[in-house]
Amino acid sequence: MIVQSKNLKSQNTKFCMVRFGNVINSSGSVIPLFRKQIAAGGPVTITHKKVTRFFMTIAEASSLVIQAGEFAEGGDVFILDMGEQVRIFDLAEKLIYLSGRNITADDNGEGIQIQEIGLRPGEKLYEELLISGKELKTPNNKIFKSNEDFPSDEVLVNAIDDLKEKIENNDIAGIKNILKNLIEGFSEV
């Protein structure tokens, strides 16, 4: 919203955004964590057996950023077609087998245990890359864009001022209410 608002005020610069999936082997990617857990003998921890995520390579992420700059008209959101979501449980299984290990149901076996630790607050079972708006084509058939709705500059400035006040007063309910009214799909945690 802030980037989209900034774009409206700019005459010389086009502002746009990219929405990433999980970048394989980046610092925050689950794959290095799983490899470390497997090397330590397990368990491999997942939040939920049904969680799915999109994945992209570092090269795809870099290309998305560069091409988004080329395709930008201003205020756009660019998203890479990353194919189907991957079930994290299946990824954990494959990495265990690729390491030459087996999976065990408990920590007394010879294999690696996959342990569900529960969803974190606000974590979803699946990712939604397109929040609102339509999926629009770009010159690259693997990259699409979405022109998502956003509040007027006046509404945004007022909301930010209200947020600052609620934060200073530690008004959690007030903060959540502002975010709920401002952000489509906002989920209270």
Regions found by a protein language model. Give the residues of each.
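Strand-loop microenvironment adjacent to phosphate/nucleotide-handling motifs in alpha/beta enzyme folds
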Residues: 3-189
